[in-house]
Amino acid sequence: TKLVYMKFFTKESNKEIIIASTRPELLCACKTVIVNPKDERYSDLIGEKITVPLTNDEVIITPHHSAKIEFGSGAVMVCSYGDQNDVALFRELELEEVVAIGLDGRMTDVAHEYKGLKPKQARTKIIEDLENAGLVEKIEDISHRTPLSERSKIPIEIIPMEEYYLKQKESVEKMKRLGSEIKFYPEMHQQILMNWLDSISID
């Protein structure tokens, strides 16, 4: 996988900040840049607006402990549905979601001129456009774990869809009672059910 070091610029001071990402095709879905609050390189920039390359969107630099000081430049762009970490951060920081990849596996309208491309195609084209604009500091080849479909071996993308959720907490005791009346083969599976029921803490 290619780790692309891209040039972002703060709005007020026009200070260059390098942000490394393996997903430059998701620049259009970037809604904040996080830095570790202990990272002295960025302590004076927290709260400032920063301009996303190519899209020219403005996002806020946000302190967050999950930004690893030693990885890349220490500054991380957070894009909705980039990976599970991004999803968790979007929920925690209550950011507005942007759906960059559709159900057809192609870039959506928010990707503008990259609309209709597959993510890998968009990545290649965006890296080329970033380089032509002088917005790439360097590119590194790295080993990167990517979840793959078991059947097709194609990288899995997180795509938001409507889902229905059932209330669980109020039925835990009833489920335990029913579970204790069922004969399990092997018997240890009954304990697996009970352990799972004990782990339910939210609806």
Predicted regions and their residues:
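Alpha-helix capping and helix-loop boundary segments enriched in small/acidic/polar residues
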Residues: 74-81, 114-118, 166
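Active-site neighborhoods of enzyme catalytic cores
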Residues: 1-26, 118, 122, 138-168, ...
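NTP-handling and nucleic-acid-processing catalytic cores
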Residues: 1-104, 128, 132, 171, ...
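Short glycine/serine/threonine/alanine-rich loop segments
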Residues: 95, 116, 135
